[in-house]
Amino acid sequence: MAKQIQAIRGMNDILPTQSPLWQKVEAVLRSSVSAYGYSEIRTPIVENTDLFKRSIGEVTDIVEKEMYTFEDRNGDSLTLRPEGTASTVRAGNEHGLLYNQEQRLWYMGPMFRHERPQKGRYRQFHQFGVEVYGIGSADIDAEVLMLSARLWEKLGISEHVTLELNTLGDPAERAAYRDALIAFLEQHKDKLDEDSQRRMYSNPLRVLDSKDPQVQGILTDAPALMDYLGEESSQHFAQLRELLDAVGIQYRVNPRLVRGLDYYNRTVFEWVTNSLGSQGTVLAGGRYDGLVAQLGGKDTPAVGFAMGLERIVLLLETLGLTQDIPAAVDVYVTAMGENCLVEAIKVAQELRSALPHLKVMSHCGGGNVKKQMKRADKSGASVALLIGEEELAEGMVTVKHLRNDNEQQQVARNALSAFLAELTK
């Protein structure tokens, strides 16, 4: 026997038993962004490597360690996309979507990072994101946060997630703070872990995000970014908090919250949970007003967020919120004998037309009554329709209930659609 080929480590199959939960999550995401008037954009999985070096930042873990990069036959350096924002900006610039225009966009699809696989963190993962271009005021920051809060409400997990907020100021304010932070870190350099020492000069704000307990202790006395904000940045953050208070969205200001990507400015945020251990962040984003120009477009304000679907699915499973997932099949149609096969297929087809919401499966491959009923039960259907010689002669269909103790009953062929509509409403 030939050796089986396995999936690549960290790249997982989503099996038929798992896909209904994924479909539920995806449906909630689509309906929620639609309610806010956002439009979908789809971009290629493969992009020029320079796109991510210029957007994410060369001195980041993603670019340095995690990207799937290869050279094609033309000698061009290409990369499987590790996140969705850069591709969305590239597409907006390329197709003239962003010049003097407002755009509210969303995307969903697979991303790739060569990380150590663990629960909630994979090498291929599915990301959902929202991006807004052309609006620089705090009210749009509030809107994307209201939209994210609506997602948790629709998924039934509002009580299990918490919003954390911070502001990174504008580039000049951040540069002044950066110098002050470097000066502080230099005084404690010998006590910093290797990762923080490496980042101290290249990306010092990322040291604030260190998970090392000793580094966190040192940072207790570090200068605060809030002290370096100008009036405009302070007012922007104050207005955002005022709007969130007005609509009842609770949050915690976390002065150490930074983002792992270089392009963020002003507002940054994360939704976190205590239910997933170390993988506590379930959605993250912020404002990135300089990225469009950085990638060759005009100066354009922008704000957005992204979330990993694997982590949301894991959270729903962990919280036991998977019971209301509908079965893959509602009605299973059987044919008891060769003469009844054509009638059974016609019944199934008519039901699909008359009741589009109904999931109807026809038995194929023949077999006796026992085999067909075993398949019907395994399908997850709530009822089986039995069509035998007797039913065929009398213009009837036998309805057998598979998930309760109701007695089976005979229904006239021409009344079957109305009967099932009432039964399944």
From Swiss-Prot:
Xref: CDD domains: HisRS-like_core, HisRS_anticodon
InterPro entries listed in its UniProt record: aa-tRNA-synth_II, aa-tRNA-synth_II/BPL/LPL, Anticodon-bd, Anticodon-bd_dom_sf, His-tRNA-ligase, HisRS-like_core, HisRS/HisZ, HisRS_anticodon
Keyword Flavoprotein: no
GO (cellular component) term, any one: cytoplasm
PROSITE patterns in the cross-refs: AA_TRNA_LIGASE_II (PS50862)
Catalyzed reactions: tRNA(His) + L-histidine + ATP = L-histidyl-tRNA(His) + AMP + diphosphate + H(+)
SUPFAM superfamilies: Class II aaRS ABD-related, Class II aaRS and biotin synthetases
Keyword Coiled coil: no
Location within or outside the cell: Cytoplasm
One of the protein's GO biological processes: histidyl-tRNA aminoacylation
Protein name (Swiss-Prot/TrEMBL): Histidine--tRNA ligase
GO molecular function: ATP binding; histidine-tRNA ligase activity
Assembly notes: Homodimer.
Keyword list, A-Z: Aminoacyl-tRNA synthetase, ATP-binding, Cytoplasm, Ligase, Nucleotide-binding, Protein biosynthesis
Primary localization class, coarse: cytoplasm
EC number assigned by the record: 6.1.1.21
Pfam family, one: tRNA-synt_His
Broad EC category: ligase
Native source species: Shewanella sp. (strain W3-18-1)
